[in-house]
Amino acid sequence: MMKRLLLYILCLFVWIQAQAQENYTLTGIVSDSNGMPIRNANVQILENNKPIAYTFTNEKGSYALSYNSVKTQVLLSIGHISFEKTKLVIDSKETKKNITLLEKKTQLREVVVKAPQIIQRGDTLSYRLSSFAGKDDYTLRDAMKRLPGIEVTNSGSIKYLGKDISNFYIEGMDLLGGQYNVATNNIPADYVTSVQVLNNHKDAKMDKDVLSDDVAINIKLSKHAKFKPVGTYEAIGGLGSNGGLYQTNGAGMLFKSRMQLLGTFKIGNIREFATDENINHFLNDQLESYGVKLLGNLSSSNAPLKRERYIHPKDYSASFNLLYKLSENKSLRTNVGYAYSQCNYAYNHKMFFGNGLDELVQDYQYQSAFTLHKPTLTIEYKDNSDKRYITNRFSSVASFVKSELPTVENNSNSVFQNEKYHDLGFSNNLSIRWKTNKFRWSLSSLLSYTTMPNGTIRVSHVGVASFQQSANSKQFTNQETISATYERRASRVYFPLSFQYRSERVYSALITDDYSGFNLVRGNELDFSFSPQYEYTHPQRKYNFKAGVSLATTRIDFENEGTTPLKKQKWSFVINPSFYFLYNVTPRVTIRIQGAFANKIGDLADFITAPIQTSLNYQRYSLGILSENRSVTLNAIYD
């Protein structure tokens, strides 16, 4: 009974309090000292210093507040981040109150602004190089190895998230093409302010609205490395087990808005560097003759140590690289290089075999000597505008190789091995592209010629049969392609038609104490292909899909007039479908899925029926049967 009475008294008290409160409404406008309305000002009614109602002003600076209060006066508070806070006491019955706020005067403290290490703007990712480079990272190549997502391989090739780059720029200009080791090895890291990764990269300006899977690198230079000649020079000396050690190198460079120049020179016997400076990462082995592929390189097994720990090198290298802009869209590039590499080393290799009773020991002592001369030349003209893209690139490379590998077996039998060959390659690649209304047109022409005038491997072995293997080769290739692309909204349909003719001649002769045989293979190959493809790109470039099929017919005519004569003529027709899907999950996360069916036939190597011997214990030949293979590939890449 007592509990019910207390509950009744409590409810009565609450009802009396509620009846005592009155409902009020307050409206008004908040403006600055110039009478301009202030948006998003915080307006509060406080009672006993506690807010009982609040709101924000609209774009016209007006506000409206409804609240309940038992008091005759309340506190009105108005605040804004850019204005001084204002508080005033008003009568509860007041229905309208306009407020003027004074601008806030803030004394800024002294701060130090630091640039972020990585900046993402659209498809461009910029690394501030000084944030990652270490104290011992003298060259650009050393510093780039520390950038997250970027990989620099032992050969100097650059990958981003596992994908090879398609272009290397210095201040937006393509000075070096695929020979960008010249830049990464010779430009000091402190000359570079940032390294930019260009995703969705298009070399041609006319393709700016086309989604691409290519990635490129652009180097941004510091102010003291631009607009005036700069250079770096270094000299090192010391003593080693075989005498004096030295290395001298220098690089002169000039980077201007219309011209770039980079010249280098190195000589030394401390480490190998000549072949590294001369690598073209975009040509690969396109200018390597067939004869070199037959003979290979004479070499011994490697010691289980880093190569630089046991070799005695002597290298020279020089390069001259010039890019000149003829106009806003036209440029001419010249790259000349020369590499000389000489390397000697001695190496002992023992192998132990046991059967539980006796132990057999095989002891090999190698003394290798290798010499290479390699000159290179590239000349490229480019016209790159919004309406057309024209490039003509002439490339040439030569290799003069001499290799010796005397070997002693079990401290008694001596084997003398040596190899010598000359290899030459030339190519001219012309590409013309333009667009008209809804069509894009493309014409391309590739001419290449490779030859190995003479290559020889000689092996003499005391008490055992010796041999001499010689080879020479010539190969001419002509590829012509015409393509039309129809564009409609987010879709494109490609219609490329291609023609390729290849003529080859390979001669090889093997002479041993008890055998003599040779190959004289002539081959002609004619290909026609039509490869239509459909492509759809999401309007916001969220994803890209491609599907196509290659319809190709090939005519081959191979004949071996050597020791084992053989002739083969054949027409073949193949269908190779493929698809590709790219999805941009975020600006830095991409998923790629691609698949293809490939139906390929063999080549001239299938008709080399007389033996080819490239070492004392290795010999190979073909059966004269044209190979055919079919494969299905499916790749999924997340990066």
Where are these regions (language model features)?
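A short, solvent-exposed loop/turn motif at the edges and junctions
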Residues: 48-50, 75-88
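Outer-membrane beta-barrel translocator domains and adjoining extracellular loop/strand segments
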Residues: 208-210, 274-280, 344-361, 402-413, ...
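Membrane-proximal, glycine/serine-rich, low-complexity loop/turn segments characteristic
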Residues: 21-22, 35, 60-62, 84, ...
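Surface-exposed extracellular loop regions of Gram-negative outer-membrane beta-barrel proteins
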Residues: 451-453, 504-505, 555, 587-630
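Short Pro-Gly-centered beta-turn/loop motif in secreted/extracellular proteins
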Residues: 36, 64-72
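Structural motif
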Residues: 27-39
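Short, acidic Ser/Thr/Gly-rich low-complexity loop/linker segments typical of extracellular
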Residues: 50-62
